[in-house]
Amino acid sequence: HSTMVPTAVSQIFEQIVNAVISLLAAKSLFDLGMKSNLVYGSTEYSYAFGAAGGALGTGAGALTALILFVGLYLMYRPKMKRRIRKEQGTSAEGYGMITSTLFLTVVPIIVSSSLYNSSTVIDNVLFGQIMTGLGEAKQIASQWGIYSGKYHLLFNIPVAVANSLSSSLIPALSRAVAEKDRKQTLNRIASAIRFSMIIAIPSAVGLAVLAAPISNLLFPGRDNTDLIKMTCYGSSAVVVYSLSTVTNAVLQGINRMKTPIRNAGISLVLHTVILFVMLRYLHMGIYGVLYANILFALFICILNARSIARFKRYRQEVKKTFLTPMVASAVMGAAAFGVYRAAYSVFGNLISTGISVLVAVAVYFVLLILLKGVDAQELRSMPGGTRLSGLARKLHLMR
């Protein structure tokens, strides 16, 4: 159907369900772990159980996406049958050709995704072994539980939203490549990257500025000092992970299926070496894992950018893609922080956080348009962009 909107929507729903189930399961199992602590005279069971509960959200999110797609398929099935009846006079491709095409397309994507996500396994193994060797075994369960069960939860949602918006443009990119329309191809690449950054950059700033309110809101009654530090220091992961994912999709959209595999493999080797040095010699602990993961995604961004430039002679536009969102996000962050501080003494954390987030969204939306970071046509091409464009006109921000 030449649309990625269902995929975009499913990614957002997947991360929302992941977040909700992870929070509920982590809390329930953490409380169960506290009872085990009392029985066995330890402090580690609660953190280990909490981390296990956080992992349950991943499966629940994936199951939700699957159910959503099955429902969409059943909804579109009558329309698909009508199209098949209309095209009965045309020659149909054989099952062998279809299977071969799917195999050659899907396998590189699966391998690339596996390499992309295997960094977490390497992090877990190296962190556990090296920290144990350094005599820091007591910190392993608690720090890793906070990192994997809470920090990842916070930054995965904006990454999913950014990537879902940008991935909705990939079919148009593939069409332009198939039609050998160089101008449209370059425009689609630029749009995909720009839309990703329009969401990712303010999300990173928002996480850094509101790290404490958000952490205390989602995980009340806990000592969130380490989580707040991780969120502040690691908020840039939203930007580099969003950019690395969308550039992977761009390379796949221009029929360079093997390139993301090579780039992810090189980045994974560099990531492993850097992580080992940070843990073993710099004694950075869980923050070594944090920074090594940011560098891993950054290496993929750099290698992917070089590959796109080489294959399509593409030159990345900087002002509208990076600088304008950064300026708008800086003002947005200051506004959100100021509003939260002013509202907290009156309303408390829950309402103050909600107000500051709404103010941040409004300020960023207005500034992005006033600074010409996005025009009416670009806004309409985004999922839900028609309504946003209408709102901008009502506010006299656009013509």
Model feature map: region roles:
Residues 1-11, 236-266:
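Membrane-interface junctions at transmembrane-helix termini in multi-pass inner-membrane proteins
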Residues 5, 16-67, 72, 258, ...:
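Membrane-interface helix-loop junctions in multi-pass transport and translocation proteins
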Residues 35-90, 97-102, 188-218, 286-312, ...:
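Short alpha-helical transmembrane segments in multi-pass integral membrane proteins
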Residues 111-158, 175, 215-222, 342:
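Helix-terminus/linker motif at the lipid-water interface of multi-pass membrane proteins
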Residues 159-179:
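Helix-loop junctions and terminal segments of transmembrane helices
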Residues 208-238:
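Interfacial segments at transmembrane-helix termini and the short loops linking adjacent helices
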Residues 247-255, 305-321, 344, 374:
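Alpha-helical transmembrane segments
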Residues 338-399:
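Membrane-proximal transmembrane or re-entrant/amphipathic helices at the cytosolic face
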